[in-house]
UniProtKB/Swiss-Prot annotation:
Family the entry assigns: Belongs to the ScpA family.
Record-level GO cellular component terms: cytoplasm
Coiled coil regions in record: none
Top-level taxonomic group: Bacteria
Assembly, per entry: Component of a cohesin-like complex composed of ScpA, ScpB and the Smc homodimer, in which ScpA and ScpB bind to the head domain of Smc. The presence of the three proteins is required for the association of the complex with DNA.
Record protein name field: Segregation and condensation protein A
Gene name, Swiss-Prot/TrEMBL: scpA
UniProt keyword terms in alphabetical order: Cell cycle, Cell division, Chromosome partition, Cytoplasm
């Protein structure tokens, strides 16, 4: 019985899982706004009131969240409110703990740890929201330098919204990931050019390669391997066919990797001893059984 209860328990470290692409609840019809996960709603309530995240009053924000749920979400015809209500239940529990006086030093420390987890998560989310426009601007600038850009204006807006609607951000700086891919490209491009004369290569129109295509390629490559299998950027991309090997392909691959990280299909790791970045396969079924 205890094991089942533990599996259903909502924890701050699991917040990112509530904003994945498999769970989209739109409340735009009633409020004029749209939230695709409870943590995004939680963060928006803080941002709209211009609260200082480092000095946030969790009791106040929790009440705002619960009030919002009562005022709007219960009026909608939505089949699945589990994640929103689960978080509301957890937040109410945290609120009651903070309101009730505590004489136990250990309990007070536990409350502080919980609060620190929320603050850390909110700071990461805030940083991600601020860096997304810069990231997209950088990608557009690089695309203009490479082959003819494939993304229409609507596609770019859709991609931007897709990133903004999710709270997850890779543990390492996005510039670090991009620079690592650039180094891999520069190292491999010479080898591939000397190995196969261009005249003998049937070129693929990379303007037709989408982010979804590259996502699928990566997932199909990782499919036979077990949970937490890892492969370096270098080892993965050296298997890319010569006819696809272009700068434009790497730009698309960069975004595809971020999307896969965001959706929880892979993680990225970097060795402290060098600049190699590894793609780590995440098997969600195996991972869920570990909690």
């Amino acid at each position: 019985m205890n094991d089942n209860n533990n599996n259903n328990e909502f924890k701050p470290e699991n917040l990112e899982s509530l904003n994945n692409t498999e769970f989209h609840i739109s409340i735009k019809d009633i409020t004029g706004k749209e939230f695709n996960g409870p943590f995004e709603l939680f963060y928006s309530l803080i941002k709209e009131r211009k609260m200082d995240i480092l000095n946030i009053n969790l009791v106040e924000v929790i009440q705002l969240y619960v009030d919002y749920i009562n005022n709007y979400l219960t009026k909608l015809k939505i089949d699945d409110l589990t994640e929103y209500l689960l978080m509301a239940t957890y937040l109410l529990e945290q609120k009651s703990k903070r309101i009730l006086p505590s004489m136990d030093t250990e309990e007070k420390i536990s409350k502080d740890i919980e609060r620190d987890k929320y603050i850390q998560r909110l700071l990461v989310y805030k940083q991600y929201q601020e860096i997304v426009p810069k990231l997209m601007e950088k990608l557009e600038r690089r695309s203009r330098m490479f082959e003819k850009p494939t993304q229409s204006g609507e596609d770019k807006e859709s991609l931007l919204k897709e990133f903004q609607d999710n709270s997850y951000v890779p543990a390492m700086d996005l510039d670090v990931i991009l620079k690592a891919m650039q180094k891999v490209y520069l190292k491999l491009v010479t080898t591939k050019k000397t190995k196969s004369p261009k005249d003998n290569v049937k070129l693929i129109d990379v303007s037709e390669i989408s982010i979804d295509d590259v996502e699928k390629e990566i997932r199909e490559f990782l499919e036979p391997f077990p949970h937490l299998y890892k492969i370096s950027f270098m080892d993965y991309f050296k298997n890319i066919p010569d006819e696809k090997f272009t700068k434009r392909y790497f730009v698309v691959a960069f975004v595809a990797i971020l999307v896969l990280v965001r959706n929880g299909h892979i993680q990225l790791e970097q060795n402290s001893s060098d600049e190699n970045i590894f793609i780590v396969k995440i098997d969600k079924e195996v991972e869920s059984n570990e909690y």
